[in-house]
Structures are given as structure tokens and as C-alpha cells.
Amino acid sequence: MTKSAELFAKAQDKIPGGVNSPVRAFAGVGGSPIFVERADGPLIFDADGKAYIDYVGSWGPMILGHNHAAIREAVISAAQRGLSFGAPTETEITMAELVSELVPSMEQVRMVSSGTEATMSAIRLARGYTGRDKIMKFEGCYHGHADSLLVKAGSGALTLGQPSSPGVPADFAKYTLTATFNDLDSVRELFTANKGEIACIIVEPVAGNMNCIPPVEGFHEGLRQICDEEGALLIFDEVMTGFRVAENCAQGYYNIKPDLTTLGKVIGGGMPVGAFGGRKDVMQYIAPTGPVYQAGTLSGNPVAMAAGFACLKVLTEEGNEKRLADTTKHLANGFKELANKHGIPMVVNQVGGMFGFFFTDQETVTSYADVAKCDIERFKRFFHLMLKKGVYLAPSAFEASFTSLAHGPKEIEATLEAADQCFAIIASETK
């Protein structure tokens, strides 16, 4: 038994399921998860000392690579001045100014401690600002574990939301409407059936929680137009895409201006940070200037702000975002070419520094319904074959994977060499 397996067995005695976030348990791929002892650059090292090329990156935050000197030094310096004050600091101002500079639609910014806090607060603000109760999300899009967002589609576009987790009252979930990602008709139908009742649309501009699904041409433009016509706010949940698909986030990449934006992951540089922001007239509705309440003991934590600021300053140095995107594109194209070589049908999607692949004979994958048709068992097999060869991909067919600036030609070529061998094994098993 490996040390990771021993630790997993031990963890299950005191930690529910042995993990502090469900996907880490490898439930989506089977087997026992690796326990990480340390990480550096593009590599993580498990409890047995084995190194893996890491394409999870702590689920997105580690965009510079692990243990980056600039972030490490910023954290140490800030920690030496105190870990938390519960009072305003100048660092909060410089961080907010940098975020607004990079993301112009965020005229004002409120810092929080997680992506879930950010989306939860943005939705409360949208409801308070518009005076409407209902919200719209998309099937397969995840916006954190707030009750109103743990809702699935039901039996059709016009069906009221049903909870997708026990503990969420059905009466509460009925205020969440679910449309089909990349389908503007489903959005229009919901607005027609709920005229004047919908406060906002919240959407991942690139859906990263049903693997990696980019928008089809005109989808976000259509959402912007519909929200303008209906008096609803458009919220871009950029917790995953923020600063990862482009320097000015997915909204800059696709040239769309949302009313509110939520951020997380990259903005903290590995520390627990989230943020939401947007139009000044909307943000003025948040306490203490407005009636919509939101607060947090550790919001704007000085150590976390220092880490996030250092991360964004390095990331936005000239050429870095292009290098990240080029590296990811090379990897994604390599996966596709190797799958074709071995006669394995596959769709590979990539935007900026995120990518995903689907074992499917479909031409494209653009919605949750498409994802559900993919070969999950083949993904599980591929994941474990790659893991044995020292490549750590997202342990779920429904999660995107990520590169970092620390991933260089050496790591990409090693990954593709491993993939070539793994595809060959899978092809031989299906003949």
C-alpha cells in the first residue's frame, strides 16, 4: 500500500470522505487519491516522493506555477507585519486599483475569501438592486455551493429549478431558473415565462465545470442584449476564467461588458481570495453605502492581498499571457493529433490557459447534454494510465485542466509522449 493510500484510509476516520472538497476523493475516476507533500514549478510530489506534471494547479489558482518566488516573498513579507487586522489596509486599495485597471467593467471591487462568497454576494446584490427575486443560470455551470446555485434544470427549459443537493429546500430553489448553455432560445423562453421577475443571468463565460466549453459565436452578445432589453443584470462568473484566458479576463477576450463580475482562484495567487465588482451605481447598493448586506471577517486579508497582487503583477508582464495560451494550445493540439493517430475519437477544447478533452465521436461539445454523451469510462482509464506515467490531470471528466507559466517545452513533450503511450494501450484494448 502506498503512503497516499494509507493517509486516505486514515483521513476517512476524522474527515468526511477523507477530503475537504469532494472532487479530491477521486470519486469521478475511482481509486485512491494522491496526497501531496510539496510542489514546485509545474510539478507536485506525493507522499511517496513521486513527481507528477501537474495540470490541476490547485484547480486553477497556480497560474505562475507552484512555489513562485514573487508570491512566496510577498506572503512572507506581509505575514511578518501581521496575519489579520479586521481593519482597512492600503494593500486593499492597491489591489482594487489593479483589478479595476485590468478589468475596466469592475469600476468598484469588494474583496471576499472565496469564489462561492463572490457569486453568492453578487446575486444578492443583483436581487437587491433590481428588486426581483428570480435568477437564471445554465445547466452544467457551477457557481459555488450557495443554496440558490445548487440547482439542476428539471425536465425542460421552462421547468422551475429543483435542488441538486439534499439540504436545499425546494421552495428556495424555485427562484433559480436553468437554461441551456449556448442556447439563446432557452434564455428567451425563460424571460417570456417570467416577465419582469428575473434579476440577473449568471454565466461562466467559458464553462469550466462541465470540462471546458467555450461559447458559440454570438452567445454572450445575445445574453448582453437580452439583459439590456429585460432590465436584468448580466453577471460573468470569472472565478475560473479570470486572468486565465486573457489579461483582462474572458470578458476582454470576447469583448463583452457585464454588469457584475466575480473572481477567485488566480486573484489570490494560491491564497483564499475572491472578489466581486462592476458598475459603480450597482456596487453602491452594497453596505455600508447601500442596503444590501455583505461582510467577512477575513475579507481583504493583508497576506492574501499581498499574494494576489504579486501574482497579477507577474502574470501581466508583457508576453506572459500569450506564452501561456501558446503552451496550452500546443498541448491541446498534441492531444488531438495523438488521439487521431490511434483512431480514438476525441474533441479537445482550449481557451487561453485552460483546456479539456472529451472521448466522443461528436463533432463538437457545446452543452451539458453533449458532455453527458461522452465516454466517461474511457476517460477514467486514460486518467489512471497517465497518472501512472507521472501526469496529473483533473480527476473528473467534468472538470477543466490548466497549464501554468512554469510548464515549458520539456513538460509538454513529456506529457504528449505519455499520452501517445496511453492512447496506444486504450486503442489495443478496444480492437
Swiss-Prot record:
Pfam family, one: Aminotran_3
Classification via InterPro entries: 4pyrrol_synth_GluAld_NH2Trfase, Aminotrans_3, Aminotrans_3_PPA_site, PyrdxlP-dep_Trfase, PyrdxlP-dep_Trfase_major, PyrdxlP-dep_Trfase_small
GO biological process entries: protoporphyrinogen IX biosynthetic process
Metabolic or biological pathway: Porphyrin-containing compound metabolism; protoporphyrin-IX biosynthesis; 5-aminolevulinate from L-glutamyl-tRNA(Glu): step 2/2
HAMAP family: HemL_aminotrans_3
Subunit structure, as described in the record: Homodimer.
Entry's family note: Belongs to the class-III pyridoxal-phosphate-dependent aminotransferase family. HemL subfamily.
Organism of derivation: Aliivibrio fischeri (strain MJ11)
Keyword annotations of the record: Cytoplasm, Isomerase, Porphyrin biosynthesis, Pyridoxal phosphate
GO molecular function terms attached to this record: glutamate-1-semialdehyde 2,1-aminomutase activity; pyridoxal phosphate binding; transaminase activity
Name the UniProt record assigns to this protein: Glutamate-1-semialdehyde 2,1-aminomutase
Modified residues (N6-(pyridoxal phosphate)lysine): K265
Lineage top rank: taxon: Bacteria
